[in-house]
Curated annotation (Swiss-Prot):
Coiled-coil intervals, chain numbering: none
GO biological process, alphabetically ordered: positive regulation of apoptotic process; positive regulation of mitochondrial membrane permeability involved in apoptotic process
Protein family per UniProt: Belongs to the STPG1 family.
Gene encoding the protein: Stpg1
Renumbered ranges of STPGR repeats: 73-80, 115-123, 154-160, 194-213, 232-254, 273-284, 313-323
Record-given protein name: O(6)-methylguanine-induced apoptosis 2
Keywords: Apoptosis, Cytoplasm, Nucleus, Phosphoprotein, Repeat
Locations listed in the record: Cytoplasm; Nucleus
Length: 341
């Protein structure tokens, strides 16, 4: 690559020999102000001088970076004063996250260019002679020639205010926002004739102190006492040591009856109720538990042995198969093999 450019540069140098350099004071082609670097491809109107160190065919070192010094300041040549980071602002755009748009107003307050309402006065010639807002309209007014009923409330000087009501009840300055207007004092009954304190009896259940026991809010009202009438036998009604009586059949009379129907039999007596020792209680624990898998898709096929309805079928160990042994054969005169006994 370097050898090719070296040969090309030497060819351009020979072609431009003896010609005056016309573009000494002008900007050469391939040179820009933004990127002041040398062009890698030479052209005809440019005189390129290749040093002897780069004319070698191999191991040539070409210049890849521009080392010309200029007056442009570098990145750290000047100081920029940045504002402090915003941490307490509601707007996320001020923090630099740019996830949500800022809620701050982008425009300042709009100041009206027109005068205010009280900044000027209207001349009397321009004002309307009749103001409809001050005129009386019969549409929204009461009839004028109807007698108005006076208020029945007393006048300020028709009653005497009680001083005790006007005084402050307590020294608390705070008052409730929704103060009740119900009087808390004693109100005498307007209907006399009620019973005196000794003319009636007070229910003692209302006066007694309730037991200090936790009581449910939904307390049952069912009575827990014994019923006065019981249909069952009492504790001493039966004897557990006595044996139960065996009912015997009643004998029919041997006298002949002249009826077409048989004589009615008496009703059997009711057997006595069993006592505490006439039956045995067995500790029944229920059917045996089988460990069954609790998978979401359990097979419905039974995994336990089921008694067969056909008892004639043999079981797994009811017979014993025997493997036949080896047999020997004899070759007879008819050229046939006969098993030997």
């Amino acid at each position: 690559m370097s050898q090719k450019f070296a040969n090309t540069g030497s060819f351009i140098e020979r072609e431009d020999l003896g010609k005056p350099n016309k573009g000494v004071d002008r900007v050469q082609k391939g040179f820009t102000a933004a990127y002041p670097t040398q062009s890698s491809i030479p052209y005809r109107h440019r005189r390129s001088v290749i040093p002897e160190s780069e004319k070698r065919g191999f191991n040539s070192q070409a210049r890849r970076f521009y080392s010309k010094k200029d007056d442009i300041p570098g990145p750290g040549f000047y100081n920029v004063i940045h504002q402090s980071l915003v941490f307490n602002s509601v707007s996320l755009s001020k923090r630099g996250t740019c996830t949500f748009p800022s809620t701050c107003a982008r425009l300042g307050p709009i100041i009206s260019k027109y005068p205010a309402a009280n900044a000027y006065t209207i001349r009397s010639e321009l004002a309307s002679k009749k103001d409809f807002s001050n005129s009386c309209s019969s549409m929204f007014q009461l009839p004028t020639f109807i007698k108005v009923v006076k208020s029945e409330t007393p006048a300020p000087n028709h009653y005497n205010a009680s001083i005790s009501i006007c005084k402050q009840r307590n020294n608390v300055c705070a008052r409730a926002g929704f103060l009740s207007k119900t009087p808390r004092g004693f109100v005498p009954s307007s209907e006399p004739g009620g019973p005196a304190p000794g003319h009636y009896d007070v229910n003692e259940s209302l006066v007694r102190e309730s037991p200090k026991v936790l009581v449910s809010c939904f307390k049952s009202k069912t009575g827990r006492g014994l019923k006065p009438t019981s249909t069952g036998p009492g504790p001493g009604y039966y004897n557990p040591n006595d044996q139960t009586k065996i009912l015997r059949k009643s004998h029919l009379p041997k006298t002949t009856l002249l009826n077409f129907s048989a004589q009615p039999l008496p009703l059997p007596e009711k057997p006595p109720l069993p006592g505490p020792g006439q039956y045995e209680i067995v500790n029944y624990q229920g059917p045996p538990k089988h460990f069954i898998s609790t998978a979401s898709f359990v097979s419905n096929t039974s995994r336990w042995p089921v008694k067969s309805s056909k008892p004639t079928l043999p079981g797994p160990a009811s017979y014993k198969p025997e493997i036949p042994g080896k047999q020997s054969f004899l070759y007879n005169e008819d050229n046939k093999w006969i098993p030997a006994v």
